[in-house]
């Protein structure tokens, strides 16, 4: 490598050349070019200055950098050296690193170069730092110039402890530890660690170090509550436990009770903690109420106080005038008022527990809503309202009867006339005629029956609370203080008494109605036999007509007399003659409620009425027979013989004659005339207006000619008047013909 001497020699040679003849001189450009070639050929190793007018070898650069560091007092920033030497910072930094690696007398730190002579300055810094620490006891490193390299100071340079960014003296830490000990000894209650730490003035790390040092020395008179890292961590001194135990023990011995709120404040809200203070045996003797612990002796005193108050107290003076002596002394006491003399901090729940204990231990005693009272008050109160209960029972029985009648007596809506030819079908003459006039839908398709919400039995009646309260207030047998309580207590008993009274009244009514029921069943049975006889008679009459008229008449017979007979049999089965008033749904529900031996035959009976088969009448007779057997209704309905039918025919003729004589409606008069003439001819039947034209056609053989002609004329006139209701002339002609027909038939 080129030495500095070689450079100097080269410089001398160049200078001599420059001093020679001008022809041999080198320009500045030539000089730079020569140097560049020398550097490129690695003949020389130099570094240019920033302005390019000066160059220096790297070895000489190291010397100049060292000189600059020593000249600066042993410490020089690299930036300052670069400015002083007018060389790029990169060359300065690279050369400084070479110096540090090859020379132990120099150190590079944080872009600053330090010389060995700088140690004298470090000693001065140590003295300065010790002085600061001694005066301020602690200060943050950021307040010091970090260029002092305080981290490299040895423990012999100054007496202190570095904790993060803070330096503490040993004397300061010892003093803070003594302060912590004094605070821990002085505390008498549970205190948060954060409060103690703030009072001592240490960081969390130094605080716990001091705390652990005291613990190791046995100088911590207490325990920690919770985790050290938790903000809720607290210190519980032993003195606090002693004071709590003394306080609770003395309070319990003096008062014989302990408030749970006080125990919770003292940290004794658990049974285990309380046992540690009083002892497990003593805690077992305590009576646990809602907000207080008390001794069994104090509990007995409370019970005896209330019992004595209940025995000695008289009722409110407003009632003494009205209440009998045995009620005045029967016993009533308010828990709160009775226990005021004991001056106990009881809440409502505690008073209720005491009242319940009294009610459970003392015979014939009740407790409710803060009052203790004797059962005799309830007994006398219930007796005092017997009159009101009896009156209400009669009212309820009447309501039940009315509702039963409504449910069973709901009439189906009026039947609309089926067609214009079905006229005059309200009265048909005779037993069968009247029944036939009801039409084929009498027992059938009604609408949905309404369901009533009114009670239908004694099990649903009850006494309202407002009503009971009014009765008791009127009787003046219950003090106003416990009136609400007595109403709640007696509500069920009063309702039971009312239902019992209703049952007794209903039982009496059943006894009274029993005889009437037998008579009613007998009448219904006679009605069934009479209807079945009429049915057989009319059925025999329909056999004289050719089909399809005969078949139509038999179907009509089923829809009229057959339906009436079925309803009568069902009425006999249930014992109430009101089935004809029921709608179809109600009737079906009534059938379903019957016993199976009765239900099935009656169900088949009503089913046969809806049949349109040729053997519908035979099915009807079979069903009637099944309904009348002993296992069902015991009606014993039988088909009548020819003689019986003749007797029924005579009765039918007589009834038709009476109706015809009193009838004035043309259409009905015509129908009755036709039925009467057939009955007189030994062919009794029942029909509606739509059969009149066909029946008249069958009368030509046995009816006089003039009568037959009148029948035809009247039939045409009736149809004309129905179709033309405003034709007064036709009505007048019809009226004349009807009168002639009526006279001719009844003569």
Swiss-Prot record:
Role this protein plays: E3 UFM1-protein ligase that mediates ufmylation of target proteins.
Gene Ontology CC entries for this record: endoplasmic reticulum membrane
Residue stretches of biased makeup (Basic residues): 429-438
The enzyme's E.C. designation: 2.3.2.-
Gene Ontology MF terms: UFM1 ligase activity; UFM1 transferase activity
Residue ranges crossing the lipid bilayer per the database entry: none
Gene Ontology process terms (BP): negative regulation of NF-kappaB transcription factor activity; protein ufmylation; response to endoplasmic reticulum stress; reticulophagy
Organism field: Caenorhabditis briggsae
Protein name: E3 UFM1-protein ligase 1 homolog
Bias (Gly residues): 439-449
InterPro entries, per database record: Ufl1 (IPR018611), Ufl1-like_C (IPR056761), Ufl1_dom (IPR056580), Ufl1_N (IPR056579)
Family the entry assigns: Belongs to the UFL1 family.
Region (Disordered): 403-468
Keywords: Transferase, Ubl conjugation pathway
Bias (Polar residues): 450-465
């Amino acid at each position: 490598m080129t030495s500095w001497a070689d450079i100097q020699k080269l410089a001398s040679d160049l200078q001599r050349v420059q001093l020679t003849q001008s022809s041999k001189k080198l320009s500045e450009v030539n000089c730079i070019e020569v140097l560049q070639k020398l550097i490129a050929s690695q003949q020389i190793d130099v570094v240019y200055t920033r302005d390019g007018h000066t160059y220096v070898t790297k070895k000489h650069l190291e010397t100049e950098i060292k000189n600059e560091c020593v000249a600066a007092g042993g410490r020089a920033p690299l930036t300052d050296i670069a400015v002083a030497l007018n060389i790029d910072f990169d060359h300065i930094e690279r050369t400084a690193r070479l110096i540090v690696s090859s020379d132990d007398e120099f150190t590079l730190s944080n872009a600053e170069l330090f010389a060995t002579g700088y140690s004298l300055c470090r000693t001065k810094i140590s003295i300065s730092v010790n002085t600061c620490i001694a005066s301020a006891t602690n200060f943050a490193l950021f307040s010091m110039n970090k260029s002092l390299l305080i981290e490299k100071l040895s423990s012999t340079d100054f007496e202190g402890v570095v904790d993060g960014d803070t330096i503490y003296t040993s004397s300061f830490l010892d003093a803070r530890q003594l302060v912590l000990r004094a605070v821990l000894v002085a505390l008498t209650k549970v205190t948060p660690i954060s409060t103690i730490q703030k009072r001592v003035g240490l960081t969390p790390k130094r605080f716990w170090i001091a705390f652990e040092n005291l613990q190791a020395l046995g100088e911590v008179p207490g325990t920690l509550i919770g985790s050290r890292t938790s903000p809720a961590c607290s210190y519980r001194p032993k003195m606090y436990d002693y004071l709590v135990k003394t306080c609770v023990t003395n309070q319990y011995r003096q008062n014989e009770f302990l408030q749970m709120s006080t125990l919770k404040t003292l940290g004794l809200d658990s049974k285990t903690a309380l046992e540690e203070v009083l002892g497990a045996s003593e805690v077992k003797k305590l009576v646990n109420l809602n907000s207080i612990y008390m001794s069994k002796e104090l509990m007995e005193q409370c019970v005896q106080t209330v019992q004595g108050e209940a025995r000695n107290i008289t009722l409110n003076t407003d009632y003494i005038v009205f209440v009998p002596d045995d009620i005045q002394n029967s016993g009533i006491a308010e828990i709160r008022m009775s226990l005021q003399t004991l001056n106990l901090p009881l809440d409502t729940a505690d008073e209720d527990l005491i009242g319940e204990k009294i009610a459970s231990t003392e015979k014939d005693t009740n407790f409710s809503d803060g009052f203790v009272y004797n059962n005799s008050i309830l007994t006398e109160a219930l007796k005092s309202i017997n009159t009101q209960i009896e009156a209400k029972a009669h009212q309820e029985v009447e309501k039940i009867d009315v509702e039963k009648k409504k449910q069973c007596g709901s009439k189906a809506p009026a039947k609309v006339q089926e067609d214009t030819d079905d006229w005059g079908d309200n009265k048909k003459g005779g037993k069968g005629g009247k029944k036939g006039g009801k039409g084929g839908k009498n027992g059938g398709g009604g609408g949905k029956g309404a369901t009533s919400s009114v009670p239908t039995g004694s099990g649903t009646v009850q006494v309202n609370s407002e009503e009971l309260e009014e009765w008791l207030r009127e009787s003046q047998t219950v003090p106003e203080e416990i009136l609400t309580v007595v109403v709640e207590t007696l509500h069920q008993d009063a309702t039971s008494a009312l239902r019992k009274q209703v049952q007794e009244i209903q039982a009496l009514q059943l006894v009274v109605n029993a005889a009437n029921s037998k008579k009613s069943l007998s009448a219904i049975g006679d009605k069934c036999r009479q209807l079945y006889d009429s049915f057989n008679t009319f059925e025999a009459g329909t056999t004289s007509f050719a089909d399809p008229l005969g078949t139509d008449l038999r179907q009509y017979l089923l829809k009229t007399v057959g339906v009436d007979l079925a309803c009568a049999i069902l009425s006999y089965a249930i014992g109430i003659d009101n089935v004809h008033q029921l709608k179809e749904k109600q009737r079906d529900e009534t059938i379903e409620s019957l016993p199976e031996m009765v239900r099935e035959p009656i169900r088949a009976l009503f089913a046969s009425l809806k049949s349109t088969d040729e053997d519908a009448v035979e099915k009807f007779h079979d069903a009637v027979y099944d309904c009348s057997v002993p296992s069902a209704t015991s009606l014993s309905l039988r088909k009548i013989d020819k003689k019986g039918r003749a007797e029924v025919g005579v009765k039918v003729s007589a009834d038709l004659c009476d109706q015809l004589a009193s009838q004035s409606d043309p259409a009905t008069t015509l129908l009755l005339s036709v039925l009467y003439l057939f009955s007189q001819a030994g062919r009794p039947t029942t029909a509606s207006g739509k059969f009149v034209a066909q029946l008249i056609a069958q009368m030509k053989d046995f009816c006089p000619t003039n009568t037959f002609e009148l029948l035809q004329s009247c039939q045409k006139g009736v149809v004309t008047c129905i179709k033309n209701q405003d034709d007064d002339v036709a009505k007048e002609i019809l009226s004349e013909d009807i009168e002639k027909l009526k006279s001719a038939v009844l003569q």
